[in-house]
A protein has these predicted regions:
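C-terminal regulatory/interaction regions
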Residues: 24-95
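Divalent-metal (often Zn2+) His-rich catalytic cores of metallo-beta-lactamase-fold enzymes
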Residues: 1-29
Length: 95
């Protein structure tokens, strides 16, 4: 908001690389079915308290949806309407 911003391309590259690292960490974490809230430790370095739960859930779901779109994970909705995510297996279904 005052001085012009310089270094846009460098900063964009840094952001993309950071998100790709986070996606890889999340993918590695999904070796077993997990809910979005179970994935917080893969993405956040600190404990997520009630005041940050909404933002953390939104950020986690965005990463999970990206992995879904890339067909790296799959989602299963259980009988209670809870979504569970895991790495997409080579073969087979959710147990």
């Amino acid at each position: 908001h005052e001085a012009p911003f310089y270094g846009l391309h460098v900063r964009l590259t840094q952001l993309i690389e950071s998100h790709e690292r986070d996606l890889d960490k999340l993918f590695d974490f999904l070796t077993e079915p997990r809910r979005a809230v179970d994935c917080f430790p893969a993405l956040f370095k600190r404990e997520i308290g009630p005041e940050s739960q909404g933002l953390a859930t939104g950020e986690t779901l965005a990463h999970l949806n990206c992995l879904l779109g890339r067909r790296r994970v799959e989602k299963h909705r259980d009988g209670d309407g809870v979504d569970w995510y895991r790495q997409k297996p080579e073969t087979g279904d959710f147990d």
